[in-house]
Amino acid sequence: MYLRYQEQDCGLTLREGIAEYHAYLGAIGRKAMVDHADSRLILEHDATHVIFGMDTSLEQEAGLDTWLIFGCQYQWRYLRGYAQLPEIKALYKALTKDGGWLLLIKLYWKCLGLKWRIIRRTRRMTHKWPFQFPEELSLIHISEPTRPY
């Protein structure tokens, strides 16, 4: 499916990109997860899909993990909170039930080339993207060369 936020010089704001990402989830029959009242973890994860131009295929999710680890500013404690969400635990449980842990190992092995390309690209970044971004950052164009962070 064509996603405008994956274009090189996309004119969308981050907020518009996230809306397009949620529409994409609906189009492929998946429900967009919603944050709890006092959390923004899911919103911030969805934003990384838009910022780094990734969809939700298993390979792209594996690549997004690498973008996040090497291309974002974050705190491990905060990221562990994402892994503890019931929806994410259920997703991992379903994946390992269908293919076992071997499926995840094969997936990451298959994606090693992609992961190395991402690591090289993150080394050329002048600023890491803040995983916990301020709300006003969602109004800035994704391709803006000088981001105020």
What are the residue ranges of the model-derived segments?
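Core of folded catalytic or high-affinity ligand/protein-binding domains
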Residues: M1-T126, P134
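Single conserved hydrophobic/aromatic residue that forms the stacking wall/gate
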Residues: I140-Y149
